[in-house]
Design a protein with these regions (language model features):
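N-terminal basic/disordered segments at the start of proteins
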Residues: 1-13
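N-terminal Rossmann-like dinucleotide/flavin-binding domain of flavoprotein oxidoreductases
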Residues: 10-70, 89-101, 163-215, 429-466, ...
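Glycine-rich dinucleotide-binding loop and its adjacent helix/turn
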Residues: 82, 96-122, 246-276, 318-418, ...
Length: 505
């Protein structure tokens, strides 16, 4: 044991001698290194299997002890350091802390992982912020271990982005088949309290004991009474873009996000509800139609206070605003889509029943203006361009790689070729980030299926005589290229979900 100016080394040595399996304790003081030969003899005479060097700078003595242990044929990995300085054995409770540091080293337990003497009791409940697949899986694992979980989700259902997907990569498994049983388990688990349409507004306390204030927005529908009969939505006169369908279809002001939603009950979009916005002067058709009388348009928000010991932030992601990247024509050319829009287009539960078609122009009878929509009777594209890294790895937008874009773009290529065998598919990529198990094999499979893979930056998407032209570079062949396509899918960069930074503070 090394000398320390701020601690009673004799007392620590006496304490150490009484620890389990401790054979001998020596105080080295400030003297020079002991000889390795002498230490070797002491190790052999005491049959030592582990040596703990304790003090402010125990690493100073480690080389000679390592040499001595090697001379005996012992395990040099069993030379353990118990650093008082590194682990903060100073000031109040310094002696207790120093003893704990020595005890941990003696028992082979890292001090950073051990309980600190005098710590407060830990609340075993966990708050999980975010009800996507990460939050769902975390909630189930903790709840199945017998611990209370509070799962907070700001939308009207759990499921997150994964609920929007058709297939997963690289196995091409059904996304809903994986996700929906987990969603049901969360909704029925006795150890999970699910709070949808909720946001965390304040967190106080310290690790192991947090007090959390949650604001739950009014749903206006009693989830225990609602039977999801859809009669309320049938009479609702308001139509707005569906968030779940990434805006490519419409929903009502009273709606259920998707058929497998949990809770499986309707909710009211107060921003677009005529009754709420007019303060009760207009509409109210849903209230009159509901056979269960479970709609209350006068419901107000409420505040919920909980106490937990752990907080998991699983708030997920959003897509970068791709309209800022003007060279790709998003919002200008009707058949330029984001990755999430294409996910919903190709999904069997989507607006076209999974048929991949180009948009159709029609007259909006209400506004008397022409608009572009996806129709199940639409025309399939003859050629599709998939552009990687839209907004990713770009100093103007996101300097980082979003990690998933390469693989889901390859998945899109497979789905397109599967549903439209004679279509021409072009993958424009910068670097193929196939980093996971089976990813490289999946990339090779897509190439073998006939997808044209072009490496290089994509410069622009333009329109010429009602035909989209994708211009870019082909690095492998040292040339500039142009391809005529009917549809463009943008692999848009990911950004943290809104409010994540605020939560972290």
């Amino acid at each position: 044991m090394e000398d320390s100016r701020n601690l009673n080394i004799d007392a620590i040595a006496k304490y150490s001698a009484n620890l389990p399996d401790v054979e001998t304790v020596q105080i080295l003081g400030l003297r020079p290194h002991p000889e390795a030969k002498t230490l070797c003899e002491q190790i052999q005479s005491n049959n030592l299997e582990r040596i703990v060097i304790a003090g402010d700078m125990p690493g100073y003595f480690k080389p000679v002890f390592t040499k001595a242990m090697a001379m005996t044929g012992g395990n040099t990995n069993e030379i353990r350091l118990a650093s008082f300085q590194e682990h903060g054995a100073r000031g109040e409770n310094a002696m207790d802390r120093a003893k704990a540091i020595v005890a941990c080293a003696s028992m082979g337990v890292p001090f950073a992982l051990a309980a600190i003497p005098g710590g407060n009791p830990v609340n075993h409940a966990t708050l999980i912020i975010g009800g996507g697949i990460a939050g769902i899986q975390s909630a189930l694992e903790i709840a199945n271990a017998g611990k209370q979980v509070y799962l907070v989700e700001q939308t009207g259902t759990i499921g997150g982005h994964m609920a929007m997907f058709d297939k997963t990569f690289p196995t091409l498994d059904c996304a809903a088949c994986i996700l929906t049983p987990k969603m049901v388990s969360v909704g029925q688990h006795e150890m999970i309290r699910l709070l949808t349409r909720s946001k965390v507004v304040a967190v106080t306390g310290k690790p192991g004991s947090y007090r959390v204030k949650i604001r739950q927005s009014a749903r206006y529908v009693d989830i225990n009474a609602c039977v999801a009969c859809n009669q309320c939505a049938e009479v609702c006169p308001v139509k707005v873009e569906s968030e779940f369908d990434a805006g490519i279809s419409l929903r009502k002001a009273i709606y259920i996000p998707f058929p497998q939603a949990v809770p499986n009950a309707y909710l009211v979009d107060e921003t677009n509800c005529l009754y709420i916005q007019s303060e009760g002067k207009k509409c109210g058709a849903c209230v009159k139609k509901c056979p269960k009388e479970c709609i209350d348009l006068s419901e107000t928000d409420r505040t919920i206070d909980i106490e937990v010991g752990n907080i998991i932030i699983a708030t997920g992601y959003e897509l970068l605003d791709v309209s800022k990247i003007e060279q790709y024509g998003y919002g200008v050319y009707p058949n330029v889509l984001t990755s999430l829009e294409f996910e919903r287009l190709t999904n069997a539960s989507g607006t076209t029943g999974g048929r991949i078609v180009t948009k159709t122009k029609r007259l909006n009878k209400k506004t008397q203006e022409e608009e572009w929509i996806f129709s199940p009777e639409g025309i399939p594209p003859r050629s599709v361009a998939l552009i990687h890294c839209v907004g990713s790895r770009n100093k103007k937008y996101n300097p980082y790689c979003s990690r998933v874009c390469c693989m889901y773009s390859l998945k899109f290529a497979h789905l397109i070729k599967e549903k439209i065998p004679n279509v021409a598919v072009y993958e424009f990529y910068i670097d193929m980030r196939a980093f996971g198990k089976g990813y490289e094999e999946f990339a090779e499979r897509i190439k073998q299926e006939g997808t044209f893979v072009v490496r290089g930056h994509t410069a622009s998407v333009a329109m010429n005589n009602e035909q989209m032209i994708v211009r870019g570079e082909d690095i492998f062949n040292d040339r500039l290229v142009e391809f005529k396509v009917d549809m463009v899918v943008l692999a848009v960069g990911l950004i943290p979900a809104p409010g994540t930074e605020e939560i972290s503070r």
